From Swiss-Prot:
Cystine pairings recorded for this chain: none
Family: Belongs to the peptidase M20A family. DapE subfamily.
Function recorded in the entry: Catalyzes the hydrolysis of N-succinyl-L,L-diaminopimelic acid (SDAP), forming succinate and LL-2,6-diaminopimelate (DAP), an intermediate involved in the bacterial biosynthesis of lysine and meso-diaminopimelic acid, an essential component of bacterial cell walls.
Residues where Zn(2+) 1 binds: 66, 99, 162
Name of this protein: Succinyl-diaminopimelate desuccinylase
Keywords: Amino-acid biosynthesis, Cobalt, Diaminopimelate biosynthesis, Hydrolase, Lysine biosynthesis, Metal-binding, Zinc
GO terms classed as biological process: diaminopimelate biosynthetic process; L-arginine biosynthetic process; lysine biosynthetic process via diaminopimelate
Catalytic activity: N-succinyl-(2S,6S)-2,6-diaminopimelate + H2O = (2S,6S)-2,6-diaminopimelate + succinate
Molecular function via GO: acetylornithine deacetylase activity; cobalt ion binding; succinyl-diaminopimelate desuccinylase activity; zinc ion binding
UniProt pathway annotation: Amino-acid biosynthesis; L-lysine biosynthesis via DAP pathway; LL-2,6-diaminopimelate from (S)-tetrahydrodipicolinate (succinylase route): step 3/3
Subunit structure: Homodimer.
Enzyme Commission number(s) from the entry: 3.5.1.18
Amino acid sequence: MSCPVIELTQQLIRRPSLSPDDAGCQALLIERLQAIGFTVERMDFADTQNFWAWRGQGETLAFAGHTDVVPPGDADRWINPPFEPTIRDGMLFGRGAADMKGSLAAMVVAAERFVAQHPNHTGRLAFLITSDEEASAHNGTVKVVEALMARNERLDYCLVGEPSSIEVVGDVVKNGRRGSLTCNLTIHGVQGHVAYPHLADNPVHRAAPFLNELVAIEWDQGNEFFPATSMQIANIQAGTGSNNVIPGELFVQFNFRFSTELTDEMIKAQVLALLEKHQLRYTVDWWLSGQPFLTARGKLVDAVVNAVEHYNEIKPQLLTTGGTSDGRFIARMGAQVVELGPVNATIHKINECVNTADLQLLARMYQRIMEQLVA
C-alpha cells in the first residue's frame, strides 16, 4: 500500500538539490499546493529560489523549510546512490531524507488532508520555502522575510520542519535558538628574523595572554531556557611556514553561541576592552548570523506539544540547543516560532536516513497543529 508522504519524499530526494540549486523541488511542491487552492508567489533572489504561498485569511500559521541539501560526500560509501531513495528495514535512505525533504513532504500532505477536511478554514495557512539554507543563507529566508515585513505581511505562528528529534519523532521540540556571532581578528606585529627578535614584534607572543584570558571568561550562566554562552576558537593562523621567520600577523577566528542573557554589542564591547587591556594592534571584523530568540509557552507551543502527545504519547522536551536555523529570521516578524521534525541522528552524514513510520507520524502531527490554530 503506497503512502503519499513517502512517495513525495522519494520524488524530492531524486532531485539533487545541492545548495542553492533547487533542482525542480519547488515546482513539485508548488504544483501540489496550487491544486488545493494556494496562491503562490515566487520570490527568487540571485541564484536562490524561494516561494511564499498562502490559502485563506486572518491569523496565519506558516510552515517553513528548505529544499536544498548538503553534498553527499563519497557516493561509493553509501549503501545506495545518495539521490536514489531506497527503503531498507523501514528506513528511507537518501540525501535530504531527514534534512529536510521528509518534513517538506509531511507538511504538504498534511495541508492536503487539512484542506480536504476544512475547505473553509477560518485562519490562513502559509508556506515559506527556500533553496538557500545549508550554504550561505544570504538570499533565502532572510530576503523573503525582509520583503514580507516591508509590506506588513501578517505572520502569527511558524512551524519550521528542521530535524529536531533525537531518538523518536517529537521527543525534542526547539522553541528557540542561541545567537551566533563570529569575530575575525588580525593581530599586527612586525615580521623579522627569529635570531633578531629585538628587531621584530611577534604577534603570536603578543596575542597569547589575550587569548588565554579570552578562553577563560565565563560569559554568563545561561537561564532556564538557554545553556551558558559558549565561545570557541575555530581557526588560528600565523607564520610563513619557515622556521626562521617571526610572523608579521596572526589571524584568529572565534565564534560565540550566546543566550538571551547577552547581546552581540555586550560581547563586542568586552572583547574590544580586552584587546585594549593587552595593548594589541589589531583589525577586527564581526559577523552576526543570528540573534537569540525564544518562543515561550503560548498557542503554538501548546499546539505542538498537544500534537506530539496525541500521536506519540510522549511529552516533548522544549530545548534551545544546537546550531542556528532559519527560525532566527522568521522570529523578526514577531511570530511564535517552533521547530519540529524527524530524528537528526544521520543528518549531513553518509547514509542519511529517516524512519518511514516517523514521516507518516509527522504528517499527522502537522495536520493536528493546523487544526488547532487555523481550522
